[in-house]
């Protein structure tokens, strides 16, 4: 007899609840149930037979996959679950007609481009460390940013005992009391740019993501969203298909 069971986190991602890694967090937090019983990491389900709920709501298959970009304002979190009741980016796309989740993360104090979708496999491939997706940030720091400090960050900074990957960093604008920098990274460690700047004595006062894998935020107003166009989708699916081929 054929076994139709798949891993629970894969089922959740295919149903548009979250990416696989975020789905694992929900399972570990005890927010997922299978047929009324709290699920554990490693559990498998038969999508046609088992009833799966997340926070009491029944999970159903995604009928149409949606992909859009959002200009995230400061003060919004991008976590799959927030016990503190803080404002969530999902609230900003509630009028999209379907439940969406963010691809990757952007700190609460940061702003700019976030991709939102209900396609868990797409999100998982795009955020996987092996994808090395380029992301561009416009970062304003207090005071002067010397070439020595920029070089140090370009070559890599030791964070939690692991050196950051080489990145591109240059001055976009100099003002009397602040410097505007551009960073291009292809990894996404927690609060990475802020911590890199802090390590060389720079204080970040504004951080905005402007581009992901060639998909640009452009003039999209803060707090607003729009569907990704055909060219943008082609750029992103090229990356996810390459990941599939590896």
Segments and roles (model prediction):
Residues 1-246:
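Basic, flexible Lys/Arg- and Gly-enriched helix-loop patches that mediate nucleic-acid binding at interfaces
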């Amino acid at each position: 007899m054929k076994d139709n069971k798949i891993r629970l986190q894969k089922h959740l991602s295919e149903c548009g609840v979250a990416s696989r890694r975020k789905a694992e967090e929900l399972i570990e937090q005890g927010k997922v149930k299978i047929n009324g019983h709290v699920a554990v990491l490693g559990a498998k389900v038969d999508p046609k037979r088992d009833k799966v709920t997340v926070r009491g709501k029944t999970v159903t298959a995604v009928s149409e996959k949606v992909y859009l970009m959002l200009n995230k304002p400061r003060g919004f979190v991008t976590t799959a679950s927030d016990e503190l009741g803080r404002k969530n980016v999902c609230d900003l796309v509630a009028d999209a007609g379907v439940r969406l989740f963010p691809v990757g993360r952007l700190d609460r104090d940061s702003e700019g481009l976030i991709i939102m979708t209900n396609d868990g496999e797409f999100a998982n491939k795009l955020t996987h460390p092996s994808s090395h997706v380029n992301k561009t940030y416009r970062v304003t720091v207090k005071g002067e940013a010397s070439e020595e400090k920029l070089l140090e960050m370009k070559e890599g900074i030791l964070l939690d005992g692991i050196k950051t990957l080489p990145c591109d960093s240059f001055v976009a604008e100099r003002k009397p009391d602040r410097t505007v920098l551009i960073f291009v990274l292809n990894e996404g460690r927690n609060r990475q740019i802020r911590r890199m700047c802090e390590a060389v004595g720079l204080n970040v006062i504004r951080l905005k993501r402007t581009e992901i894998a060639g998909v640009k935020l452009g003039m999209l107003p803060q707090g607003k969203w729009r569907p990704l166009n055909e060219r943008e989708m082609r750029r992103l699916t090229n990356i996810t298909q390459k990941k599939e081929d590896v």
